[in-house]
């Protein structure tokens, strides 16, 4: 079971690409809050290492057991930063948090790197990685009502752009 508290979060990382023949546990990413900033470590699962994959997915992650820590000059491993949203996606997530806070009559909380990573709607996520907060839990983010990015908004944008094209 994943541990999640005010000080640490354990994220189950799954690889999901055709060559694997299905979703495969790759390992666990741990985010620990240290002096107001998250420090990340990653440990490959025993199964992933036993598969004998020679694929180096991040130059800062070597294929061996045990925790490996992200470099101080990086907010996370590049592999996971690639799965996180860009600047605009982060703005959308901050707006979603503000809306949620208003609905729950509380102050918006400051989002951390792990919140951005886990906040991308699973079905819209780019790349071959998927994430859970427990081994038997759902892939996240799975909130259909507040998906980031909101696909309905993209359709509205498409319609507006088509109207502009037709005016010419």
Where are these regions (language model features)?
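Phosphate/dinucleotide-binding and metal-coordinating scaffold of catalytic cores
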Residues: 1-168
